[in-house]
Amino acid sequence: MSAFLPPIPTPSPDQVRKYLARWREGDNEKIDAALQIVFHAMPRNDDLGEVGVKVAALNGLYSTNIFGVVQVARHIIALDIDAILADNIVVPDLVERIANVDFGGKRRRNYSFATKYCNFHRPDVYPIYDSLVVGVLSALLKQGEKFDTFTPGEHWGTDYAIWHRSISRFRTHYGLDEYSMRDLDKYLWMVGKERKGMFAGPVPASGGSPRVV
């Protein structure tokens, strides 16, 4: 975020409601609804065709840079993740195991994709990690907001447990318990999209095209 951008308003229920209303007005809501239909219709992760469709749909609509859909689908099936996803407690290691895929002897870490894949199965448990949301949270911390504190070596992008902790503390700190993890993701993403658009003209109510991270 640029030093020339105005401060982000302190998060509050009113702020969240405002940005969620903008989200619902635009195309992102329709894309989310379509993906939810896909994931709800195929909740299990033990069939190559079904997992492949979910990987391809998520990758195509959210530009998650998955280059080997079938290979990633086989990788997910081999992890046997359904029992873990059924649990109501976040398992950070699940995100890491989905994220780390071997391609021709080289390991690729599809971190943002893995958080989205878990989120579309369990939006109440697994918050999405992406660059716009990171930018907003980082800007708030630089503004002096105190929703979380960190010890040396803790990083959102390398440890999903830290990311989940920060989102959870963010919700509690600002009195946003009425909103789901997914609602907070939409709010933060819309704030980030708006700030990014301040250098490229007004951001439409739709929030623009599907997120690219």
Indicate residue ranges for each PLM-predicted region.
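An N-terminal alpha-helical hairpin/helix-loop-helix interaction module that forms a charged
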Residues: M1-K106, P123-V213
